[in-house]
Amino acid sequence: MKRGLLLLLLYFSFLSAFAQQMDGELYNLAKTKSGYRSKRISSYDKSGYNGDRIVGIKPNEKVIICNIQGAGIINHIWFTIAPPPHLISRNDIILRIYWDENDYPSVESPIGPFFGQGWDESYNFSSYALTTGPANGTGMSTYFMMPFGKGARIEIENQADNVIDNIFFYVDYYEVDKLPKDMGRF
């Protein structure tokens, strides 16, 4: 009897030892963060119709995707582009990201390699901070944290010889009262 009680006590001790920690990542998802507001800028059609895209970016044309004022942290960017990669090279579409009202970009890269699709190829893959899919990697996402103190601007330049028919995008970010201490720049 004593042995059975001891085994039962040990069993419940092990259960509590291996239970989910109350300070883990899933627990922290449910916590509100004072001074943080979740925001999104996207290509949605403000008229309510289904024209959720930027249409017809001509060769050598630049388009501003977003211009955010104040402090914040971009936590997700998603793009999909038409025509597909075999008709317009993702190496000829340049992504530029500017921080804090700078005249020069901190990020300047062909959009394909920025999202992990080098060698002028498109394919599905998933990593911690980058993912592409579902159809031959045409949807491209990044989850890199990109803090900024005074503002952020993202632009696309078409350096291809043909028109970019459509660009669809999301830029998700936290608007913050003040950046956390010791935040660098991407």
Features from the language model and the residues they span:
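Bacterial Sec-dependent N-terminal signal peptides
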Residues: 1-21
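Beta-strand-centric surfaces of beta-sandwich/beta-rich domains
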Residues: 20-186
